[in-house]
C-alpha cells in the first residue's frame, strides 16, 4: 500500500512537474518498483522526497532561465546591464584593502571605459587579453569590460612565476596584458621572453623604473576613455567568456574555457539552491582568478544584485572583524580556511557577526560540526564542482560532511554517476558489455557526468589544449556511444543519495596492506601538533611494499614535543596510519586556493642529504620519534631499521 502510494507520488512529480513522457515515466516506475527492495525504498522515499522535489525545482528553474538566455542570446554583460537598471546606486563591490565602495553604476562605467579603451587600441571580439593582478574591484571591472567588447580574458594565477607564467601568457595568445603594480617584478623576470607585439598595461601605483620599458600606466588612460557602452559584439550565451587556469600541481597550468552559459549556470544553481537573497552581503576572500571567487562569489553581484566584499587575501585574524564591519551575511570558504579559523584562539568578534551561511567546498566532516557550532553559522552550504566539470553538486539541506546529493528515486533526471575504478590507476572498470559498472551505496567510485553538448547544463567546454580534453572524456559510460566527463575524484554515495568526497586522486597511499587517507591523517596531526598546516604523503622505502607515511608540519619556531606526540598518536590513529617520518619546516607552500603543494615534498623524501629541515623517524623499538641523521638513513636504506 505504502509502496503504491510512493510510486503514485513519483508518477505525479515526474509527469506534472518534470513533464516527462508517459513511456519514460512508466518504465521508470517499473524499474523503481522491481529494484526498490520494499521497505528500503519507502524509507528512502520518505526521507528524501522533500529534498529531491526542491532540488528538481531548482534544476527546472535554472534550465528555464538558461533556455531563455539561449533564445535571446544574452551574455553576462547583458545580464549585468539589467542588474544595473534595477538598482544603479546600490553598492556592488567593496574592496577591504582601501575601503573603496563601487556602486553598480560605477562598476558599469569603469567596465565600459575598459571596453572603449581596448577597442581604441585595436582589440576586437574574439581577441584575448590577460589579467595578472591581486584581488580588488578593478579586477572585476577589467574582465567585465573585456567581455563587453567580446574580448576573452585570461585570468592568470598570481602565484605563477617564470616558466609557468610565460606558458600561460603564450598559450592564451593574448594580445594585451594588464598587470597590477604588485606583480611588476614577476613580469620583468619574463619580459625578454614575451612576444614583442604584446601590449603591456600596469594598473595601480606607477613607478616607471619598476616595469618593462614598453609598459603604459592604465589608470589615467581609462579615466580619459568614454564611459558609455560600446557597440555590442556578436556573442551568444554559449560563446567564450574567459579562461581560468588549473593550479598546475601536476604539470603546467591548463586553460579551462568558461563560456557565458557556464558562468550563469554555476552562479544561478548556487543562488537558488542555497536560497540566497538579493540583500545578502558576501565576504569573498578567495582568489578572483579561480571560479569559486569569481563565479560563485562575484557572480552573485553581477547577476543577482548582491553586494560583495573583496579581500586581497584571506586573514584568519581579521576574518570576523571584516564580517562585522561590512555586515556580511554570507562568507565564502574552502576547507583549509575553516581549519585556520578554528585554530585561532576564541575571541568575542567570532560571535558578534550577522553571518547566516558559509558557502564553499572541501570542509572536512571531522571539523564540520565544530566549525558551525563555534561560530554560530546556521547553514553550511557545501558544493562540489571544478571550473570545467558538468556534474556540479550541492548540499542544499546541510547534511554534515556531504558535498551534494543525487536522487535515488529520480536519478535519471540528473545524469551523473559513480562508476567503479581501480583507485591506484583511476582506470574505469567495465562490465562484459563494455559499459562502466555503476557503484552501489557505500561503494567508492569516480564521479562522471554525461556530456550533452546541446544542453548548456550538460556540455563540456574543456580546455584550450585539445590533448587535455581527451584525457577528461570517456566513451561508453552510461550506454554505448555516449561520452562522459571524468572528474578524477572518488566519492561515496550513501543509501539516501548523499555524496561524500573521499579523496582526490593521489590523496591515498597503501601501507601495511591498508589504504591510508591523507586528509584524515592531516586533520588528526594538525590537532595534535597544534599546527595549522600539515601535509601527509607516502614515500618509497627500499625493501618494503607500498609507501610509508610521511608528515611535514609548519612550525616557525621548530618547537614540538615529539614524545607526547607519539603517545597521543597511539590513542588516535591505527598503527598503519601513523606517519613513519616527520619533517618540521618554517612554512608549507600552498596553491592560490590554499591547497598544500606536496609534489616537491614527495620528491625530496626523507634523505637528510637533500632535506635541510629537521627530520625524525618513528623508532619501532623505542616507540617514539628520534632524529633522522645520515647514519639512521643508511640503516633504513639497507633494511636494518624496523619500520
UniProtKB/Swiss-Prot annotation:
<keyword id="KW-0436">Ligase</keyword>
<dbReference type="InterPro" id="IPR042099">
    <property type="entry name" value="ANL_N_sf"/>
</dbReference>
<dbReference type="GO" id="GO:0044539">
    <property type="term" value="P:long-chain fatty acid import into cell"/>
</dbReference>
<keyword id="KW-0445">Lipid transport</keyword>
<dbReference type="GO" id="GO:0031957">
    <property type="term" value="F:very long-chain fatty acid-CoA ligase activity"/>
</dbReference>
<protein>
    <recommendedName>
        <fullName>Long-chain fatty acid transport protein 4</fullName>
        <ecNumber>6.2.1.15</ecNumber>
        <ecNumber>6.2.1.3</ecNumber>
        <ecNumber>6.2.1.-</ecNumber>
    </recommendedName>
</protein>
<keyword id="KW-1133">Transmembrane helix</keyword>
<keyword id="KW-0256">Endoplasmic reticulum</keyword>
<dbReference type="Pfam" id="PF00501">
    <property type="entry name" value="AMP-binding"/>
</dbReference>
<keyword id="KW-0812">Transmembrane</keyword>
<keyword id="KW-0547">Nucleotide-binding</keyword>
<dbReference type="GO" id="GO:0000166">
    <property type="term" value="F:nucleotide binding"/>
</dbReference>
<feature type="transmembrane region" description="Helical">
    <location>
        <begin position="20"/>
        <end position="42"/>
    </location>
</feature>
<dbReference type="GO" id="GO:0005886">
    <property type="term" value="C:plasma membrane"/>
</dbReference>
<feature type="binding site">
    <location>
        <begin position="243"/>
        <end position="254"/>
    </location>
    <ligand>
        <name>AMP</name>
    </ligand>
</feature>
<keyword id="KW-0276">Fatty acid metabolism</keyword>
<dbReference type="InterPro" id="IPR045851">
    <property type="entry name" value="AMP-bd_C_sf"/>
</dbReference>
<feature type="transmembrane region" description="Helical">
    <location>
        <begin position="139"/>
        <end position="156"/>
    </location>
</feature>
<comment type="function">
    <text>Mediates the import of long-chain fatty acids (LCFA) into the cell by facilitating their transport across cell membranes. Appears to be the principal fatty acid transporter in small intestinal enterocytes. Also functions as an acyl-CoA ligase catalyzing the ATP-dependent formation of fatty acyl-CoA using LCFA and very-long-chain fatty acids (VLCFA) as substrates, which prevents fatty acid efflux from cells and might drive more fatty acid uptake. Plays a role in the formation of the epidermal barrier. Required for fat absorption in early embryogenesis.</text>
</comment>
<dbReference type="GO" id="GO:0047676">
    <property type="term" value="F:arachidonate-CoA ligase activity"/>
</dbReference>
<dbReference type="GO" id="GO:0005324">
    <property type="term" value="F:long-chain fatty acid transmembrane transporter activity"/>
</dbReference>
<dbReference type="InterPro" id="IPR000873">
    <property type="entry name" value="AMP-dep_synth/lig_dom"/>
</dbReference>
<dbReference type="InterPro" id="IPR022272">
    <property type="entry name" value="Lipocalin_CS"/>
</dbReference>
<dbReference type="GO" id="GO:0001579">
    <property type="term" value="P:medium-chain fatty acid transport"/>
</dbReference>
<keyword id="KW-0443">Lipid metabolism</keyword>
<keyword id="KW-0813">Transport</keyword>
<comment type="similarity">
    <text>Belongs to the ATP-dependent AMP-binding enzyme family.</text>
</comment>
<dbReference type="InterPro" id="IPR020845">
    <property type="entry name" value="AMP-binding_CS"/>
</dbReference>
<dbReference type="GO" id="GO:0005789">
    <property type="term" value="C:endoplasmic reticulum membrane"/>
</dbReference>
<keyword id="KW-0472">Membrane</keyword>
<dbReference type="GO" id="GO:0090434">
    <property type="term" value="F:oleoyl-CoA ligase activity"/>
</dbReference>
Amino acid at each position: 500500500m505504502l509502496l503504491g502510494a510512493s510510486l503514485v507520488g513519483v508518477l505525479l512529480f515526474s509527469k506534472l512537474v518534470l513533464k516527462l513522457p508517459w513511456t519514460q515515466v512508466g518504465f521508470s516506475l517499473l524499474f523503481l518498483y522491481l529494484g526498490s527492495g520494499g521497505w528500503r525504498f519507502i524509507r528512502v522515499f520518505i526521507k528524501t522526497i522533500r529534498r529531491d522535489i526542491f532540488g528538481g525545482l531548482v534544476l527546472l528553474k535554472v534550465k528555464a532561465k538558461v533556455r531563455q538566455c539561449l533564445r535571446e542570446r544574452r551574455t553576462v554583460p547583458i545580464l549585468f546591464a539589467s542588474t544595473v537598471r534595477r538598482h544603479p546606486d546600490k553598492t556592488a563591490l567593496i574592496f577591504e584593502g582601501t575601503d573603496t565602495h563601487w556602486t553598480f553604476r560605477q562598476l558599469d562605467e569603469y567596465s565600459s571605459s575598459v571596453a572603449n579603451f581596448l577597442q581604441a587600441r585595436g582589440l576586437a571580439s574574439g581577441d584575448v587579453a590577460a589579467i595578472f593582478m591581486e584581488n580588488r574591484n578593478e579586477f572585476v571591472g577589467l574582465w567585465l569590460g573585456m567581455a563587453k567588447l567580446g574580448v576573452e580574458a585570461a585570468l592568470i594565477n598570481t602565484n605563477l612565476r617564470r616558466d609557468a607564467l610565460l606558458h600561460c601568457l603564450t598559450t592564451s595568445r593574448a594580445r594585451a596584458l594588464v598587470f597590477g603594480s604588485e606583480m611588476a617584478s614577476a613580469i620583468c623576470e619574463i619580459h625578454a621572453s614575451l612576444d614583442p607585439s604584446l601590449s603591456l598595461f600596469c594598473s595601480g601605483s606607477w613607478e616607471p623604473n619598476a616595469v618593462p620599458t614598453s609598459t603604459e600606466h592604465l589608470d589615467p588612460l581609462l579615466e580619459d576613455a568614454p564611459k558609455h557602452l560600446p557597440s555590442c559584439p556578436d556573442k551568444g550565451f554559449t560563446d567564450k567568456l574567459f579562461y581560468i587556469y588549473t593550479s598546475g600541481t601536476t604539470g603546467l597550468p591548463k586553460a579551462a574555457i568558461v563560456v557565458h552559459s557556464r558562468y550563469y549556470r554555476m552562479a544561478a544553481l548556487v543562488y537558488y539552491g542555497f536560497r540566497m537573497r538579493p540583500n545578502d552581503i558576501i565576504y569573498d576572500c578567495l582568489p578572483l582568478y579561480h571560479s569559486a571567487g569569481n563565479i560563485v562569489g562575484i557572480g552573485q553581484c553581477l547577476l543577482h544584485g548582491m553586494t560583495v566584499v573583496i579581500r586581497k587575501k584571506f586573514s584568519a585574524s581579521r576574518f570576523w572583524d571584516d564580517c562585522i564591519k561590512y555586515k556580511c551575511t554570507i562568507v565564502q570558504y574552502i576547507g583549509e580556511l575553516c581549519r585556520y579559523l578554528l585554530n585561532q584562539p576564541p575571541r568575542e568578534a567570532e560571535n558578534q557577526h550577522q553571518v547566516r551561511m558559509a558557502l564553499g567546498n572541501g570542509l572536512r566532516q571531522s571539523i564540520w560540526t565544530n566549525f558551525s557550532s563555534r561560530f554560530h553559522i546556521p547553514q553550511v552550504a557545501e558544493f562540489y564542482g571544478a571550473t570545467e566539470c558538468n556534474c556540479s553538486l550541492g548540499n542544499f539541506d546541510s547534511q554534515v560532511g556531504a558535498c551534494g546529493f543525487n536522487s535515488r528515486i529520480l536519478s535519471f533526471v540528473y545524469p551523473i554517476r559513480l562508476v567503479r575504478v581501480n583507485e591506484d590507476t583511476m582506470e574505469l572498470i567495465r562490465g562484459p558489455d563494455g559499459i562502466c559498472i555503476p557503484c552501489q551505496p557505500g561503494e567508492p567510485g569516480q564521479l562522471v557526468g554525461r556530456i550533452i553538448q546541446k544542453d548548456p547544463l550538460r556540455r563540456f567546454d574543456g580546455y584550450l589544449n585539445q590533448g587535455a580534453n581527451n584525457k577528461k572524456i570517456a566513451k561508453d559510460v552510461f550506454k554505448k556511444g555516449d561520452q562522459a566527463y571524468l572528474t578524477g575524484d572518488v566519492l561515496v554515495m550513501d543509501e539516501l543519495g548523499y555524496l561524500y568526497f573521499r579523496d582526490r586522486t593521489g590523496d591515498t597511499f597503501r601501507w601495511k596492506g591498508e589504504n591510508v587517507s591523507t586528509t584524515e591523517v592531516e586533520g588528526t596531526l594538525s590537532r595534535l601538533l597544534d599546527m595549522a598546516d600539515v601535509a601527509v604523503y607516502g614515500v618509497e622505502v627500499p625493501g618494503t611494499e607500498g609507501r610509508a607515511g610521511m608528515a611535514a608540519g609548519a612550525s616557525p619556531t621548530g618547537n614540538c614535543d615529539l614524545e607526547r606526540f607519539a603517545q597521543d598518536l597511539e590513542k588516535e590513529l591505527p598503527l598503519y596510519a601513523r606517519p613513519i617520518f616527520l619533517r618540521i619546516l618554517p612554512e608549507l607552500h600552498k596553491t592560490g586556493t590554499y591547497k598544500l603543494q606536496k609534489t616537491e615534498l614527495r620528491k625530496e623524501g626523507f634523505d637528510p642529504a637533500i632535506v635541510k629541515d629537521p627530520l625524525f623517524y618513528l623508532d619501532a623499538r623505542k616507540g617514539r620519534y628520534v632524529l633522522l641523521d645520515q647514519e639512521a638513513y643508511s640503516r633504513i636504506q639497507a633494511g636494518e631499521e624496523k619500520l
